[in-house]
Each structure stands twice: as structure tokens, then as C-alpha cells.
Amino acid sequence: METVVDNSGYPLTSGIGFHKEGRNLVLTLNKRSLVSNMQSDAGAFEGWALCLFANNPGIYEKIFIQWNPIERFDKEGIITDAERGHYYRFLYRAYKFQDNYPTIVELQPAVSSVFDVDEFKDWVLNYPNGESRESQKSNKNAEAHLERELLEIMQSAFDYCDHQLPVGLFFKDVSKKTARCSGGLGQIDLWSVLNGSLNIYELKNDVNLSVGIISELMFYTNVMNDFRMHRFNYPAEFVRKRKFYRHSKELYDSISKDEISHVNGILLANNLHPRITDNVIDLMNQNAVHITYSKQTVNDFISLLRR
């Protein structure tokens, strides 16, 4: 193996091994990568892979993701509950990464060779059980505060919109015992629906610069695309609820009626990691599932909404 070619001038994370093998970019993930938060440097394998591939044109033809499965991970004592949630999410993310980019991404081993991917068909989403908490208004830099400010401006620009949409995934029904990803805590920052398009915004403030924003957004857009395609659904008890929160019923109804035809993912930040170039966005848009990605500054987004 050769040293990885990277002409960006910016440091690589120490949490992932990077090598060049002929015309192939090889990422080697250790156990920490498999059980880390996807926005962490060690966990954001999609972000690092796409940035290196796109920003070094003509150098690489394929991306290989090498990893060692954690045996008996679903048994108590092998890994912690939190790590198990991250590992289930890794399995889904890795499977989707190859599914989204089948001509350039190869998993070694393939997820389907070590995990029954048919289980994904039985995963269900959790849903809001109440209004979100008021953000800490004294902290003007907090993403939660910025999120609420943007949501207020968004109200008149879309068919409907909201924030903190849960994306916890569970096996057949929502319970602590059946939790798969996020432990019920994962949520989409901001989202909107307009003319049949579901827009997913991954919001970062001016000091939160990370390649992991790519991995986060790709996870959320793939989950919502699977929801749109009826591969995921809300559990049966959702429709029996008397009260719904954060426009979850409107979204459910739109999806049930096949009114959502497209998913857009938007990196929403005034400053992004310098590796996240236009070349990276172009590569992200070459996915086989027709999710559209873009980046937009918070300032431009506000200006557009106020026109």
C-alpha cells in the first residue's frame, strides 16, 4: 500500500487509516470508528472518503472501506448500549453508502455478508411526543437558538416546516429493548416541505467545522428517503394518537399519499470544513437514489426567505 495522495494541505483524522492501493482509495476503520458518533472525525467515514476522492481528481477510481465486524455485538457485555446504537447505525450507513454510490464504493466485507439486511425492512421511526424544549436564549452562539430563529423566518416560505424531527430507528416497535439507532435521541435540525420536495437541513454555527456534517446529512436524507419510499414507517400506534407534534402528522399524511417525490439535503452553515468543496457536493449528487445535495450559508438562506 502507498501513502494516501491528498493535495488539500489539511490534516487527516487519526481515527481512520488512509492508504492508496493502485487507483483505489482505501479507508481502514478500527473498532472506534464503528462505535463512534457519526459526526466525530473517527466516525465520519463517508465524509472523509468523499472529500479525498473528489478533491484529488484523476487520482482515485474507487473507494474501499475496510472494517472488521464486531461479533456477537447484540449480546450484553460485548459493547455498551450506546456503542451498540452507533454500530447498528454504522451498518445502515455503510450499506447505504455502497447502495448510493455502487460504481465507486465497495465495502470489505459487504454489510450483507455479516448482517441480515432484510432486518432493515422491519425498522420503524420514532416520532415527536411533545413540543421541543425552549432553547437557551442567553447563548447567542448555540445552534439550538439559531435553529429557532431560522424556523420562525421559515414559516411563511413552505407548505409546512419544523425542527427536531426524530430519526431514531427501532425494530418493529418503539421501546428501549428494540432500539437500533440513536436510542431515540437523533433528530433532524430543520426540515421543510414545498411542492412535493422534503428538504433536510443540517445546521452548524460559525465555530462548528467538521467533515462529519456530510455523514450526518447523508444518514438523515437516506432515512427520510426510505420513509418516503415506505421502507421505513411510523409504528402502528402513531395513527391512533389524539395529538400530534412538530408537523409529524402532516409529514406522515404527505408520505402516505405519495405526495413527497424527492428529498433534498442542505448543508446549512456560514463556514464549512475547508475540505467540503464544490467538487465534493458534485460527487455527492452522483448518487444512484436521486437525493439532491447542496450547501448554503445561513446568511444567504435568511436573505432568500425574507424576499
How would you describe each model-predicted region?
Residues M1-R307:
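Charged, terminal alpha-helix-loop-beta segments
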